[in-house]
Amino acid sequence: MPVTDSIADFITRIRNAGSAKNKTTDIPYTRVRENLSKLLVEKGYIQNYTVIKTEADKFPFIRVELKYTADGRHAIKEISRVSSPGRRVYQGKDIKRYLGGLGLFILSTSKGILTDKEAREQNVGGEVLFRIY
C-alpha cells in the first residue's frame, strides 16, 4: 500500500517503536528520511541510523537505533507532524521557538532540512515539517 505522507510515516514508526521499547526500527528509504535521521542523530534524539541495501531486498531501508534515558524512557517525549499534504504550514524568517527553546521545529528550507534555530541563524523560512521534544 503506497504511503501518501512519508514524513508522517517516518514519525509514526519512530514514535511506535519508542512506545514499544524497541531498540531499532526499520523504515523504507527515501533521501528525505535519511536527512531527517541524520538531523535527529545530530540533535541527540536517536542513537544512530544505517542505510541497508541488500541484493535480496528490492528496496533499501533505514535501520534507526532508538535512544533511551538511564531509567528506560524514550529520549523523544513528543514528536508530531505540523504540515501535512492537505494543510501545508509555512513559516517566514521570524520563526518562533517551540516550548521556549526546549523543543525543535524541523523545517524544509531552500538550504535543506534545518532546525528552527539553524533557520533563524541563516535567516531563511520554509515548510514546518514536524515538532519534537
Curated annotation (Swiss-Prot):
It comes from the Bacteria. GO terms for molecular function: rRNA binding; structural constituent of ribosome. The gene is rpsH. GO terms for cellular component: ribonucleoprotein complex; ribosome. Pfam families: Ribosomal_S8. Belongs to the universal ribosomal protein uS8 family. Part of the 30S ribosomal subunit. Contacts proteins S5 and S12. Keywords: Ribonucleoprotein, Ribosomal protein, RNA-binding, rRNA-binding. PANTHER family: 40S RIBOSOMAL PROTEIN S15A. This is Small ribosomal subunit protein uS8.
